[in-house]
A protein has these predicted regions:
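Catalytic alpha-helical scaffold of carbohydrate-active enzymes acting on polysaccharides/glycoconjugates
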Residues: 1-109
Length: 109
């Protein structure tokens, strides 16, 4: 990820309204590196890994959507990010699954 984009995203926690935050990141497809995307609603594995790493470095804890909604109704400490992979494509689990697992992150499929 470019230094400029990392710098820009570093303002996210500071510019959001005070209080707990639940960010939701949604992807339709996950592409292997070098694979030509069929449409722009997908993400490459390396990009997904950078998203996970950057949001983790910014202090977001990865949760499922259900966990994030329960957290909003409960204690609400810190910041949470819910990754959602919709449409049930095999690449969601086959490619995103290992990237999430390596980081101990959870997501909604």
């Amino acid at each position: 990820m470019s230094r400029w984009l990392r710098w820009l995203l570093s303002f996210l926690p500071r510019t959001a309204p005070p209080g707990p935050r639940l960010a939701i990141v949604r992807h339709h497809r996950v592409y292997a590196e070098g694979q030509q995307p069929l449409y722009r609603l997908g993400v490459g594995v390396a990009t997904l890994e950078r998203q996970l790493d950057l949001l983790g470095a910014l202090g977001f804890t990865p949760v499922t959507v259900a966990e994030g909604l329960a957290w909003l109704r409960g204690a609400r400490d810190g910041m949470r990010v819910a990754f959602s992979f919709d449409d049930g494509y095999r690449d969601n689990v086959a490619l995103a699954g290992p990237a999430l697992e390596r980081r101990g992150a959870r997501a909604t499929f």
